[in-house]
């Protein structure tokens, strides 16, 4: 059977591949500690679940408007105003089946074959593949631990060509945990201001999971004049431990939002009606429900960073946001390769070695466009983290 060139250009999710391999080994009786997951280990808060149960009992189980219910859109508008000082109208809001669909809709609505999308690396694994589905060209700007995984204005300017159509910024970052400051975003905005045809996608999914104590800002807080060509992407998955509910949302120029809604109308149509009620309860409800989770992430972040940095050959920064440690393992790879312990000098070989010998599942940095690193999620118990570090330290000693 012939498959399209489009589908052959994309790869299965590396994070899901790690999870699947870890699950297979676990089923074989191995005591696997999974640190590959990209979701909180907390339960959805009770008041959110109760809202969904009430919706079911009230029969709110039919189609809704493609772009989301009017009341959920209003909750999103209120959230943007209250927390981000951003003003949107209902026609500038779209609710989708997860943040991934929001970005998918945006790319399909704005990118033509050959159009270039600038993506700083390391990046969320889905960005480039979604661009490839639209037959666009991902253009990567490489960073590393030396740059704290953040691009400079000069790097951005050098990446721009006449074919550049979109720039993607993700802060706090999955996988690196880096967070752009107001001043850094202002500097990037100064470059983008010179190129009025470039759209800006700011992925704020980890907005509330800030670990450094500083307040959240995105590029529109830094450069309000760019609002007419910026789409703000967000969702309830991470902040409210609602990954399985599949509700993402975005705010942006009405013409782009309408185009995105047209794309969505021919794929999933409306997001799940019950999940929309739950998302509305999350956005309108008591926001203190996030506090215990974020405090736990801060404690785990501090422990994991200190513990990993005590192991010879690996190094990581204290994450400023999200719930990942993005670990530089280049020295460890070099040593193991010299000793002919690894099959090759890739981070994939290293992560396979750690999985098979230490029984700890991690995602290789190359999955995020950053060879020589591994991503460890600390969205798990402290006991799991302590045991995982103990195993990795023993393996690399």
Swiss-Prot record:
InterPro entries: Aminotransferase_I/II_large, AspAT/PAT-like, NHTrfase_class1_PyrdxlP-BS, PyrdxlP-dep_Trfase, PyrdxlP-dep_Trfase_major, PyrdxlP-dep_Trfase_small
Subcellular location: Cytoplasm
Record-listed L-aspartate binding positions: 38, 124, 174, 375
GO biological processes: amino acid metabolic process; biosynthetic process
Keywords attached to this entry: Aminotransferase, Cytoplasm, Pyridoxal phosphate, Transferase
Cofactor(s) needed by this chain: pyridoxal 5'-phosphate
GO molecular function, one term: glutamate-prephenate aminotransferase activity
Pfam families given in the database record: Aminotran_1_2 (PF00155)
Annotated site residue numbers, Important for prephenate aminotransferase activity: 11
Catalyses which reaction(s): L-aspartate + 2-oxoglutarate = oxaloacetate + L-glutamate; L-arogenate + 2-oxoglutarate = prephenate + L-glutamate
UniProt superkingdom: Bacteria
EC id: 2.6.1.1, 2.6.1.79
Alphabetical list of Gene3D superfamilies matching this protein: Aspartate Aminotransferase, domain 1, Type I PLP-dependent aspartate aminotransferase-like (Major domain)
SUPFAM superfamilies in UniProt: PLP-dependent transferases (SSF53383)
Main location: cytoplasm
Oligomer status and interactors: Homodimer.
Name this protein carries in UniProt: Aspartate/prephenate aminotransferase
UniProt organism field: Nitrosomonas europaea (strain ATCC 19718 / CIP 103999 / KCTC 2705 / NBRC 14298)
Gene name of this polypeptide: aatA
């Amino acid at each position: 059977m012939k498959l399209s060139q489009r589908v052959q250009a994309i790869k299965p999710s590396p994070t899901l591949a790690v999870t699947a391999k870890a699950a297979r080994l676990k089923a074989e009786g191995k005591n696997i500690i999974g640190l590959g997951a990209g979701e909180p280990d907390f339960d959805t808060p009770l008041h959110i679940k109760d809202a969904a149960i009430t919706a079911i009992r009230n029969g709110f189980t039919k189609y809704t408007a493609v772009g989301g219910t009017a009341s959920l859109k209003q909750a999103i508008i209120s959230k943007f105003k209250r927390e981000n000082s951003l003003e949107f109208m209902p026609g500038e809001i779209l609710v989708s089946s997860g943040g991934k669909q929001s970005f998918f809709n945006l790319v399909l609505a704005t990118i033509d074959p050959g159009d270039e999308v600038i993506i700083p690396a390391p990046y969320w694994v889905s960005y480039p593949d979604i661009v490839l589905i639209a037959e666009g060209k991902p253009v990567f700007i490489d960073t590393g631990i030396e740059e704290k995984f953040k691009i400079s204005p000069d790097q951005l300017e050098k990446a721009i060509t006449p074919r550049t159509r979109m720039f993607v910024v993700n802060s706090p970052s999955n996988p690196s945990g880096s967070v752009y400051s107001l001043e850094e975003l202002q500097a990037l905005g100064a470059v983008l201001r010179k190129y009025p045809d470039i759209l800006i996608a700011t992925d704020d999914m980890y907005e509330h999971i800030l670990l450094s104590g500083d307040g959240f800002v995105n590029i529109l807080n830094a450069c309000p004049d760019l609002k007419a060509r910026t789409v703000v992407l967000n969702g309830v998955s991470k902040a409210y431990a609602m990954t399985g509910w599949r509700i993402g949302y975005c705010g942006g120029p009405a013409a782009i939002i309408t185009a995105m809604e047209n794309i969505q109308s021919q794929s999933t149509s409306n997001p799940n009606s019950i999940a929309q009620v739950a998302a509305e309860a999350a956005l309108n409800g008591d926001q203190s429900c996030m506090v215990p989770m974020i405090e736990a992430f801060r404690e785990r972040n501090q422990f994991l960073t200190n513990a990993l940095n005590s192991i010879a050959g690996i190094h990581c920064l204290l994450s400023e946001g999200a719930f990942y440690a993005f670990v530089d393992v280049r020295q460890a790879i070099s040593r193991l390769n010299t000793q002919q312990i690894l099959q090759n000098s890739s981070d994939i070989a290293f992560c396979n070695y750690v999985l098979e010998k230490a029984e700890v599942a991690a995602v290789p940095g190359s999955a995020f466009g950053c060879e020589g690193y591994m991503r460890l999620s600390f969205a798990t118990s402290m006991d799991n983290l302590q045991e995982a570090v103990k195993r990795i330290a023993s393996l690399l000693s």
